[in-house]
């Protein structure tokens, strides 16, 4: 049957990508449907119960700056918070939160169910109807047809999903859930470039069977961090400890002796697994010289005894899992509540995507999350937000934007998408700060300053968040002006206080603002001396802007040069064979990727600076010819 309501956006999948996509589209005013195989699993944390980490928290903050749900849900469910790299530079500091699975899922569901313009429907999607090269409807497992102007597909690991435990395998999207077989077959019929990837998860353990007394305690940070710009420590539930144990020589021997029973090493799994989150059998094989690996024992929540042993993801047979877990200190009597497993699934070459995450081959069909070859909740969520935003822009009038995608210098989201569509991926892609060439400008702490104004123009940021952002920016400007007006000299009261509190002897006069340039003086010192009343976030922004000013200015100069290339668009149907002087190899690479700008063309492996110059000259010449024809 035809469903009586027509939608602007239909989102398939209720994981981290799907929920952010649906919320973004609905916030912008699009009539949105979120189609999920099970309403009870909306926002499910299928693997580790944690949000954030190196590179990942930057993405979470960007989702938050654009009005998304992930960061606030983390503040409402986080049972341990830590700042990683806290002693390193501001660019690489990252917040990580251990989350209560049940509380996180509840927070996401509450947000979804209270979002205007958003309907939720429980049923699997079996087909996407395409007419004249454009997605027009989604068909469910029972034949219900939802007509729509755009489709966002966020299928996670469900497309053609196969679960492996030892040499036994079964079809599944994750443990306990059916895979999407018909939809996977349909996408293959549409001739989209498909591949197979693999990911895995460890066994879960009953905390009552664990001896924590022989493990290292890993407490959270004090004072407690927050994940969202709108978050507050008062939102946090009860805080708990994590623990650390280690594998040992016996553990490694057990695993090595059973590699022939591993689906990875026997050749049963064809898909490539995540390089930066390998299974324990892969770690022991690749790092044969190491006789021990850290294993983090992480609580799954406040109302469950289940533990997540981070670091022993595996697809070995259950009897082997039991044996190697029992070989570790503190886990000698551990009761396994769920076995670890690997899952193999379909993904589609992200080089077939536009920067908006719309497919190049089918109009108004957007992909987000693991279907694009990424791994991680944060990577999925930020893609979902981008895809949902651009799907909504197709249907909602916006005076500022026809489409939106951030550049590499604007957001880690821009880095992630550019990496995917330019280089593609043959293994699950994970974000790191090292992937961003402008990471000093793309800090976790300034995502709101980079993106919230854009989010407001897009319709993603509500009045409450916008007011909070404006108040913060006004406080930064006001406090900066105040500090610039306060002078310290070797003889005056302020100068003497500075020396007394910090040990820094003044040899000449300086403003309180300029004193922050000294490595040993921090905003907290100046705030105490000058009776500042601003909050820590404001002080942090002022201190970073002063201490890193020279480096930031140099990066900005690099960005200004790069923007000239970013502003030179390349038509999607550009004929690279007409560019005189390009080698056949470069022509083939450009034709395969179909870069949208000269800057993106320059990031393709093997495309030389000389080739970019030739391309720029040809584009300029063609523009002149076109202008002349239009004039006549």
UniProtKB/Swiss-Prot annotation:
PROSITE patterns recorded: GIDA_1 (PS01280)
UniProt KW Transferase keyword: no
GO molecular function: flavin adenine dinucleotide binding
Binding site for FAD: 13-18
Gene Ontology biological process: tRNA methylation; tRNA wobble uridine modification
Primary location recorded for the protein, binned into one broad class: cytoplasm
Lineage top rank: taxon: Bacteria
Locations listed in the record: Cytoplasm
InterPro entries according to UniProt: FAD/NAD-bd_sf, GIDA_C_N, MnmG, MnmG-rel, MnmG-rel_CS, MnmG_C, MnmG_C_subdom, MnmG_C_subdom_sf
GO cellular component, one term: cytosol
Pfam families tied to this protein: GIDA (PF01134), GIDA_C_1st (PF21680), SAM_GIDA_C (PF13932)
SUPFAM superfamilies according to UniProt: FAD/NAD(P)-binding domain
UniProt entry keywords in alphabetical sequence: Cytoplasm, FAD, Flavoprotein, NAD, tRNA processing
Essential cofactor(s): FAD
Positions of NAD(+) binding: 273-287
Family, similarity comment: Belongs to the MnmG family.
Subunit structure, interactors included: Homodimer. Heterotetramer of two MnmE and two MnmG subunits.
Task of the protein: NAD-binding protein involved in the addition of a carboxymethylaminomethyl (cmnm) group at the wobble position (U34) of certain tRNAs, forming tRNA-cmnm(5)s(2)U34.
NCBIfam families hit by this protein: mnmG_gidA
UniProt xrefs under HAMAP family: MnmG_GidA (MF_00129)
Protein name, entry field: tRNA uridine 5-carboxymethylaminomethyl modification enzyme MnmG
Organism the protein comes from: Psychrobacter cryohalolentis (strain ATCC BAA-1226 / DSM 17306 / VKM B-2378 / K5)
């Amino acid at each position: 049957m035809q469903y009586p309501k027509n939608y602007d956006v239909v989102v398939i999948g209720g994981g981290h990508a799907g929920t952010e996509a649906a919320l973004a589209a609905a916030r912008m005013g699009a009539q949105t449907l979120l189609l999920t195989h099970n309403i009870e699993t909306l926002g499910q944390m299928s693997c580790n119960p944690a949000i954030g980490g190196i590179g990942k928290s930057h993405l979470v903050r960007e989702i938050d700056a654009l009005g998304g749900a992930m960061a606030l849900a983390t503040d409402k469910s986080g049972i341990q918070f830590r700042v990683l790299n806290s002693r390193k530079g501001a660019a690489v500091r990252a917040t990580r939160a251990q989350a209560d699975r049940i509380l996180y899922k509840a927070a996401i569901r509450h947000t979804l169910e209270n979002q205007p313009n958003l309907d939720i429907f429980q049923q699997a999607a079996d087909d996407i109807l395409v007419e004249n090269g454009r997605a027009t409807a989604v068909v469910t497992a029972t034949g219900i047809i939802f007509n729509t102007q755009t489709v966002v597909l966020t299928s996670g690991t469900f497309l053609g999903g196969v679960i492996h435990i030892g040499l036994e395998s079964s079809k599944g999207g994750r443990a306990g859930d059916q895979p999407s077989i018909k939809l996977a077959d349909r996408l293959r019929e549409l001739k989209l470039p498909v591949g197979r990837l693999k990911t895995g998860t460890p066994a879960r353990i009953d905390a009552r069977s664990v001896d924590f007394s022989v493990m290292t305690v890993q407490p959270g940070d004090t004072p407690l961090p927050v994940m969202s710009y709108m978050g507050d420590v008062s939102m946090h539930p009860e805080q708990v400890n994590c623990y650390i144990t280690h594998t040992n020589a016996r553990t490694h021997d057990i695993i090595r002796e059973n590699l022939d029973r591993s689906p990875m090493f026997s050749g049963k799994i064809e898909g490539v697994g995540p390089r930066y989150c390998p299974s324990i059998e892969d770690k022991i094989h690749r790092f044969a010289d190491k006789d021990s690996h850290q294993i983090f024992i992480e609580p799954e929540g406040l109302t469950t005894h289940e533990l997540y042993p981070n670091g022993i993801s595996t697809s070995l047979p259950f009897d082997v899992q039991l044996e190697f877990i029992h070989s570790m200190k503190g886990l000698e009597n551990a009761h396994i509540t769920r076995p670890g497993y690997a899952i193999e699934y379909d993904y589609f070459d992200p080089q077939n995507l536009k920067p908006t995450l719309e497919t190049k081959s089918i109009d108004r069909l957007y992909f987000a999350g693991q279907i694009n070859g990424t791994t991680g909740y944060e990577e999925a969520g930020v893609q979902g937000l981008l895809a949902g935003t651009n799907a909504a822009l197709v249907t909602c009038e916006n005076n500022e934007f026809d489409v939106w995608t951030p550049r590499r210098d604007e957001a880690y989201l821009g880095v992630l998408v550019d990496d995917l569509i330019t280089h593609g991926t043959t293994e699950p892609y994970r974000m790191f700060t090292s992937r961003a060439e402008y990471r000093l400008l793309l800090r976790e702490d300034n995502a709101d300053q980079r993106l919230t104004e854009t989010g407001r123009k897009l319709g993603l940021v509500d009045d409450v968040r916008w007011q909070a952002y404006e108040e913060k920016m006004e406080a930064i400007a006001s406090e900066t002006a105040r500090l610039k007006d306060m002078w310290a000299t070797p003889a005056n009261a302020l100068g003497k206080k500075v020396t007394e509190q910090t040990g820094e002897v003044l040899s000449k006069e300086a403003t309180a603002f300029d004193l922050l340039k000294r490595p040993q003086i921090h905003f907290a010192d100046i705030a105490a001396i000058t009776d500042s009343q601003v909050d820590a976030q404001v002080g942090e922004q002022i201190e970073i802007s002063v201490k890193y000013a020279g480096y930031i200015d140099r990066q900005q100069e690099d960005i200004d040069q790069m923007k000239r290339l970013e502003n030179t668009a390349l038509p999607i149907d550009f004929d690279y064979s007409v560019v005189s002087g390009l080698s056949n190899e470069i022509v083939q690479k450009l034709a395969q990727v179909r870069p949208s700008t000269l800057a993106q063309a320059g990031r393709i492996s093997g495309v030389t600076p000389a080739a970019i110059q030739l391309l720029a000259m040809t584009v300029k010449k063609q523009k002149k010819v076109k202008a002349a024809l239009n004039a006549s």
